[in-house]
């Protein structure tokens, strides 16, 4: 079980033994970002990818050692949108940061991140998007809330609604269906 404990400016990404509750490892970088940590295998290394207060990080799943980090400072203090893992790439978004896809890579013994694409046509605040068959679907906070779809491979905007749809949305995939529930329950 892995999650970020603590609060603003003070926290640690922490792994706990599921049977005993004892701490297995703890990475003390900057404070938590309130997004759910994701497990990814990148370049053969099992790692935990998460958003912190000021970065997106990849730490080794077995011991919590920092592998890579990428600056990620949004207008809001709660980076709460869970990163999307697509193969060995990471797709991220934050309040007024647009959306970016990047690729962590290991060159020799050193990790780095390379931007694949970025767009500022949509951006998210509290609503995590969903990846469905190569399409990223979600709720942008721009234009007072608009649903959108992006080509996850290129970052091209496929469509956007007019706006004024909702403040936030829960986007859920169930088989071939997407459910987009707004904050009014519609």
Descriptions of predicted regions:
Residues 1-186:
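Noncatalytic, solvent-exposed loop/strand surfaces
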